[in-house]
Every structure is written in structure tokens, then in C-alpha cells.
């Protein structure tokens, strides 16, 4: 670690570990159990504390706070941690809080994500890769977000909710139910509007397969009869469509939340 990369006003506790070419800007505060991997850059006024690891090439902007204790009354100073992957862009005023005993003790963020101004990632969240969270997205505790999802600005997600891969949530959406992979949801109360067809096309999914998957989803959520029976019928009918299979697998997993449905 070169001292020339550390601003003289930064406060770095003894015990903090830095990789190669780490840059720490003015007035940053780094705790004693923080690990910053190669090429991490802290612009200024960044606070990183707790048992926290930041992956290589991640850039963190002013007034972000990473690794502080979870905002829960039952937190008892357990030694939980925050793990953030590589190549993330974490903009101003983002908060990522440590895990808790009730959630596996780790808040985990993947790679190649963009978290815009004011994003909050609560305790014990499991955040995937290649995500975009727009300004002031707020995630409560224990939320799982799959790869390539996009969450629009000022949206809030209820604790324990799952957000499926490649889905898109429109801005200002309160999300209190699971969002299926590829789902497109928005509203004052998030409802399913179809599949994220534009995003799927951009990611190289076959257009015909995507449209077939949309038909399958409509049969599941808008068809007649028992919901569980419809899932089984659609699974058999579209068993050769990998997108449908991925959605069916998601629907069959255990969850404490309901699913976002089409507006009736």
C-alpha cells in the first residue's frame, strides 16, 4: 500500500487490510476489520466499519456507509459481516448494513452492480450480479435479488421478498410479494404486467421463446382452476422452454411471501 494513495485526513484503524493500488480520499474512516481488495477507490467521506470486505475495482462515492450494524432492535452485537464483490459502483449516500443472527450473519452483494444515490440494502440481503438499483431504492432485511434485475427509483421492497433474475420493477413501486424471473412489475402496489421482454431481448434471449414464456405466465396467473394445478399443467406443456422452466422452478420454491399477480 502506497501512502501517496491515502489522503492525510483519512482515519484508518490499525488492523485494516488493503490490497494493491487502493485509493482512500479525504475524510474517509476505515474500521480495524475492513478488507479492501486491489484497486478499490473511496472518493471521500466514506465510512466502512465492522467485519467488511470490498472486492477489487469497486468505487465508492462520498458519504456512503458500509458495514454498520443492522437496524433491528434484537441485534445483540453479534459479529456479523458485510461482503461486497468486485467491480461495483456505489454512489453517494448508499448504505449497506451487516447481517444478523436471524439471517445467517452475512449481508452479501455480488459483482458488477450499480447502486445509485441513496440506495439502502438492509441486513442479511443476498444481492446478485449485474444489477441496477436506481436512486433511493430501499431494501428491507433478508431480501434476495437475482442477477440482471433492475429496480426503479424510490421503490421499496418488503423484508424476505425475492426478486427474480432479469426482472424489472418500475419506479415508485412498493413491492410486498415475490417477483418472478423476467417479470415486469410496477404500480402504487406492485402488480405483474407481463415479462421484461425488452430486457430479455437485450440480453440475447430468443424472441420466440420469450413470447411463448409470456403465454405460459398468462396461463399460470390468469387461467381457470387451482393455481398449483395450473403450474403443473404449464410445466408439462412448456417443458422444452428454458425460460418457462426457470419461472416454474421459482414458483415451486418455498417462500414466506405471495407472488405479484396481474391486476384484475
Curated annotation (Swiss-Prot):
Keyword Chloroplast: no
Catalytic activity field: a (3R)-hydroxyacyl-[ACP] + UDP-N-acetyl-alpha-D-glucosamine = a UDP-3-O-[(3R)-3-hydroxyacyl]-N-acetyl-alpha-D-glucosamine + holo-[ACP]
Molecular function GO labels: acyl-[acyl-carrier-protein]-UDP-N-acetylglucosamine O-acyltransferase activity
Listed PANTHER family: ACYL-[ACYL-CARRIER-PROTEIN]--UDP-N-ACETYLGLUCOSAMINE O-ACYLTRANSFERASE, ACYL-[ACYL-CARRIER-PROTEIN]--UDP-N-ACETYLGLUCOSAMINE O-ACYLTRANSFERASE, MITOCHONDRIAL-RELATED
GO biological process: lipid A biosynthetic process
UniProt-listed Enzyme Commission number(s): 2.3.1.129
Native species: Rickettsia prowazekii (strain Madrid E)
Alphabetized Gene3D superfamilies for the sequence: Hexapeptide repeat proteins, Udp N-acetylglucosamine O-acyltransferase, C-terminal domain
Keywords assigned: Acyltransferase, Cytoplasm, Lipid A biosynthesis, Lipid biosynthesis, Lipid metabolism, Repeat, Transferase
CDD domains: LbH_UDP-GlcNAc_AT (cd03351)
GO cellular component, as recorded: cytoplasm; membrane
Family to which the UniProt record says this protein belongs: Belongs to the transferase hexapeptide repeat family. LpxA subfamily.
Protein name, as recorded: Acyl-[acyl-carrier-protein]--UDP-N-acetylglucosamine O-acyltransferase
This protein's pathway: Glycolipid biosynthesis; lipid IV(A) biosynthesis; lipid IV(A) from (3R)-3-hydroxytetradecanoyl-[acyl-carrier-protein] and UDP-N-acetyl-alpha-D-glucosamine: step 1/6
Amino acid at each position: 500500500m502506497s501512502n501517496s494513495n491515502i489522503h492525510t485526513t483519512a482515519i484508518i484503524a490499525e488492523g485494516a487490510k488493503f490490497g494493491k493500488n487502493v485509493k482512500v480520499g479525504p475524510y474517509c474512516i476505515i474500521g480495524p476489520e475492513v478488507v479492501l481488495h486491489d484497486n478499490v477507490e473511496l472518493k471521500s467521506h466514506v465510512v466502512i466499519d465492522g467485519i467488511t470486505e470490498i472486492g477489487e475495482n469497486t468505487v465508492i462515492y462520498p458519504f456512503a456507509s458500509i458495514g454498520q450494524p443492522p437496524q433491528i432492535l434484537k441485534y445483540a452485537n453479534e459479529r456479523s459481516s458485510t461482503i461486497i464483490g468486485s467491480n461495483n459502483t456505489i454512489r453517494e449516500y448508499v448504505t449497506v448494513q451487516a447481517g444478523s443472527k436471524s439471517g445467517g450473519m452475512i449481508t452479501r452483494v455480488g459483482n458488477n452492480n450499480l447502486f445509485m444515490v441513496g440506495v439502502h440494502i438492509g441486513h442479511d440481503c443476498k444481492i446478485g450480479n449485474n444489477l441496477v438499483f436506481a436512486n433511493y431504492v430501499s431494501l428491507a432485511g433478508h431480501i434476495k435479488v437475482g442477477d440482471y434485475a433492475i429496480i426503479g427509483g424510490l421503490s421499496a421492497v418488503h423484508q424476505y421478498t425475492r426478486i427474480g433474475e432479469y426482472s424489472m420493477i418500475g419506479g415508485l413501486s412498493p413491492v410486498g410479494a415475490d417477483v418472478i424471473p423476467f417479470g415486469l412489475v410496477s404500480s402504487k402496489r406492485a402488480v405483474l404486467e407481463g415479462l421484461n421482454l425488452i430486457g430479455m431481448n437485450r440480453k440475447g434471449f430468443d424472441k420466440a421463446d420469450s413470447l411463448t414464456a409470456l403465454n405460459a405466465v398468462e396461463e399460470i396467473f390468469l387461467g381457470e382452476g387451482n393455481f398449483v394445478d395450473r403450474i403443473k399443467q404449464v410445466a408439462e406443456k412448456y417443458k422444452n422452454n428454458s425460460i418457462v422452466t426457470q419461472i416454474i422452478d421459482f414458483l415451486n420454491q418455498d417462500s414466506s411471501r405471495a407472488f405479484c399477480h396481474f391486476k384484475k
